[in-house]
Amino acid sequence: MNGLRSIAPELPFAIEYIEIQEEEQRFSCESFQLEAFKVQHSIPCFGYKITIPRSGKFSVERAREAGIPVSCWNRLQHGEAVEYEGSLFTPDMVMGEARRGISVVYCTDTRPIPRIAEKAKDVDLFICEGMYGEEDKLSNAKKHKHMTMEEAAILGLEAQPREMWLTHYSPS
Protein backbone atom coordinates (compact mmCIF):
# COMPACT_ATOMS: atom_id res chain seq x y z
CA MET A 1 0.00 0.00 0.00
CA ASN A 2 2.89 2.35 0.69
CA GLY A 3 3.97 2.05 -2.94
CA LEU A 4 0.54 3.13 -4.15
CA ARG A 5 0.42 6.02 -1.70
CA SER A 6 3.83 7.25 -2.89
CA ILE A 7 2.60 7.68 -6.48
CA ALA A 8 -0.98 8.68 -5.60
CA PRO A 9 -0.97 10.20 -2.10
CA GLU A 10 -4.49 11.57 -2.35
CA LEU A 11 -7.16 9.61 -4.15
CA PRO A 12 -10.73 10.84 -4.71
CA PHE A 13 -12.15 7.52 -3.49
CA ALA A 14 -11.71 5.14 -0.59
CA ILE A 15 -9.52 2.07 -0.95
CA GLU A 16 -10.09 -1.03 1.11
CA TYR A 17 -7.10 -3.33 1.09
CA ILE A 18 -5.89 -6.49 2.76
CA GLU A 19 -2.19 -7.24 2.91
CA ILE A 20 -1.51 -10.81 1.89
CA GLN A 21 0.53 -12.65 4.50
CA GLU A 22 0.26 -16.28 3.39
CA GLU A 23 1.44 -18.37 0.42
CA GLU A 24 -2.23 -18.57 -0.58
CA GLN A 25 -5.13 -16.51 0.65
CA ARG A 26 -8.83 -16.51 -0.28
CA PHE A 27 -11.29 -13.66 -0.07
CA SER A 28 -15.01 -13.49 -0.71
CA CYS A 29 -16.78 -10.39 -1.87
CA GLU A 30 -20.46 -9.96 -2.61
CA SER A 31 -20.36 -11.21 -6.17
CA PHE A 32 -17.03 -13.02 -6.56
CA GLN A 33 -14.22 -14.94 -4.89
CA LEU A 34 -10.57 -13.96 -5.12
CA GLU A 35 -7.64 -16.28 -4.53
CA ALA A 36 -4.14 -14.84 -4.23
CA PHE A 37 -1.21 -17.24 -4.58
CA LYS A 38 2.49 -16.58 -4.28
CA VAL A 39 4.58 -16.89 -7.44
CA GLN A 40 8.36 -16.95 -7.96
CA HIS A 41 9.91 -13.53 -8.55
CA SER A 42 12.80 -11.55 -7.09
CA ILE A 43 10.38 -9.58 -4.88
CA PRO A 44 7.09 -10.78 -3.36
CA CYS A 45 4.54 -11.24 -6.16
CA PHE A 46 1.18 -12.93 -6.39
CA GLY A 47 -1.01 -14.43 -9.05
CA TYR A 48 -4.76 -14.12 -8.77
CA LYS A 49 -7.74 -16.30 -9.53
CA ILE A 50 -11.12 -14.62 -9.71
CA THR A 51 -14.27 -16.74 -9.75
CA ILE A 52 -17.75 -15.39 -10.31
CA PRO A 53 -20.40 -17.93 -9.31
CA ARG A 54 -23.51 -18.25 -11.47
CA SER A 55 -26.94 -19.18 -10.27
CA GLY A 56 -29.12 -21.67 -12.08
CA LYS A 57 -31.39 -20.80 -14.97
CA PHE A 58 -34.82 -19.40 -14.25
CA SER A 59 -37.58 -21.77 -15.37
CA VAL A 60 -40.48 -19.87 -16.87
CA GLU A 61 -42.38 -23.14 -17.11
CA ARG A 62 -42.01 -23.89 -13.39
CA ALA A 63 -42.97 -20.31 -12.50
CA ARG A 64 -46.14 -20.52 -14.58
CA GLU A 65 -47.02 -23.97 -13.19
CA ALA A 66 -46.67 -22.59 -9.65
CA GLY A 67 -48.88 -19.61 -10.53
CA ILE A 68 -46.18 -17.08 -9.73
CA PRO A 69 -47.01 -13.62 -11.13
CA VAL A 70 -44.51 -12.19 -13.64
CA SER A 71 -44.01 -9.18 -11.34
CA CYS A 72 -42.26 -11.52 -8.84
CA TRP A 73 -39.90 -13.21 -11.29
CA ASN A 74 -37.04 -10.72 -11.18
CA ARG A 75 -36.70 -10.84 -7.40
CA LEU A 76 -36.82 -14.65 -7.43
CA GLN A 77 -34.05 -14.69 -10.08
CA HIS A 78 -31.93 -12.58 -7.72
CA GLY A 79 -32.33 -15.02 -4.85
CA GLU A 80 -35.08 -13.25 -2.91
CA ALA A 81 -38.15 -14.92 -1.47
CA VAL A 82 -41.32 -13.04 -2.42
CA GLU A 83 -44.60 -12.82 -0.53
CA TYR A 84 -47.54 -12.03 -2.79
CA GLU A 85 -51.21 -12.01 -1.83
CA GLY A 86 -50.66 -14.39 1.06
CA SER A 87 -48.42 -16.83 -0.87
CA LEU A 88 -44.69 -17.23 -0.34
CA PHE A 89 -42.58 -17.93 -3.41
CA THR A 90 -38.95 -18.97 -3.02
CA PRO A 91 -36.11 -19.10 -5.56
CA ASP A 92 -35.81 -22.89 -5.28
CA MET A 93 -39.29 -23.14 -6.80
CA VAL A 94 -38.14 -21.67 -10.11
CA MET A 95 -34.33 -21.81 -10.30
CA GLY A 96 -32.32 -24.69 -11.73
CA GLU A 97 -29.04 -26.03 -10.37
CA ALA A 98 -26.18 -23.55 -10.08
CA ARG A 99 -24.21 -23.28 -13.31
CA ARG A 100 -20.46 -23.41 -13.69
CA GLY A 101 -18.98 -20.07 -12.65
CA ILE A 102 -16.75 -17.81 -14.71
CA SER A 103 -13.07 -17.88 -13.76
CA VAL A 104 -9.96 -15.92 -14.68
CA VAL A 105 -6.33 -16.39 -13.60
CA TYR A 106 -3.93 -13.44 -13.91
CA CYS A 107 -0.26 -14.14 -13.39
CA THR A 108 2.84 -12.08 -14.27
CA ASP A 109 6.31 -11.43 -12.89
CA THR A 110 7.20 -15.04 -12.21
CA ARG A 111 9.09 -18.10 -13.30
CA PRO A 112 6.87 -21.02 -14.29
CA ILE A 113 5.88 -23.06 -11.23
CA PRO A 114 3.36 -25.93 -10.90
CA ARG A 115 1.04 -23.85 -8.71
CA ILE A 116 0.24 -21.59 -11.69
CA ALA A 117 -1.02 -24.46 -13.87
CA GLU A 118 -2.96 -25.86 -10.90
CA LYS A 119 -4.75 -22.54 -10.33
CA ALA A 120 -5.38 -22.03 -14.06
CA LYS A 121 -6.78 -25.55 -14.58
CA ASP A 122 -9.89 -25.34 -16.78
CA VAL A 123 -10.43 -21.60 -16.23
CA ASP A 124 -12.26 -19.51 -18.79
CA LEU A 125 -9.34 -17.12 -19.26
CA PHE A 126 -5.68 -17.49 -18.31
CA ILE A 127 -3.70 -14.23 -18.57
CA CYS A 128 -0.02 -15.05 -18.26
CA GLU A 129 3.24 -13.28 -18.88
CA GLY A 130 5.41 -14.22 -21.81
CA MET A 131 8.25 -11.75 -21.32
CA TYR A 132 10.67 -13.22 -23.86
CA GLY A 133 9.76 -14.57 -27.28
CA GLU A 134 13.11 -16.00 -28.32
CA GLU A 135 14.54 -19.27 -27.02
CA ASP A 136 17.98 -17.69 -26.57
CA LYS A 137 16.48 -15.35 -23.93
CA LEU A 138 15.85 -18.21 -21.49
CA SER A 139 18.87 -17.24 -19.40
CA ASN A 140 17.49 -13.68 -19.14
CA ALA A 141 14.10 -15.06 -18.12
CA LYS A 142 15.69 -17.15 -15.38
CA LYS A 143 17.93 -14.32 -14.21
CA HIS A 144 15.10 -11.76 -13.98
CA LYS A 145 12.47 -14.27 -12.76
CA HIS A 146 10.21 -14.06 -15.80
CA MET A 147 8.98 -16.55 -18.41
CA THR A 148 9.56 -17.12 -22.06
CA MET A 149 6.50 -17.40 -24.27
CA GLU A 150 7.26 -21.09 -24.69
CA GLU A 151 7.29 -21.64 -20.92
CA ALA A 152 3.96 -19.81 -20.65
CA ALA A 153 2.54 -21.94 -23.46
CA ILE A 154 3.60 -25.11 -21.62
CA LEU A 155 1.73 -23.90 -18.52
CA GLY A 156 -1.26 -23.30 -20.78
CA LEU A 157 -1.06 -26.85 -22.14
CA GLU A 158 -1.01 -28.20 -18.59
CA ALA A 159 -3.86 -25.97 -17.42
CA GLN A 160 -6.12 -26.33 -20.47
CA PRO A 161 -7.92 -22.98 -20.10
CA ARG A 162 -10.71 -22.15 -22.53
CA GLU A 163 -8.67 -19.12 -23.64
CA MET A 164 -5.15 -17.86 -22.90
CA TRP A 165 -3.63 -14.43 -23.37
CA LEU A 166 0.07 -13.68 -23.16
CA THR A 167 1.05 -10.29 -21.81
CA HIS A 168 3.96 -8.44 -20.20
CA TYR A 169 6.30 -9.12 -23.11
CA SER A 170 9.52 -7.35 -23.88
CA PRO A 171 10.18 -5.79 -27.29
CA SER A 172 13.89 -6.70 -26.95
Predicted feature residues:
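Metal-dependent phosphodiesterase/nuclease catalytic metal-binding core
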Residues: 21-166
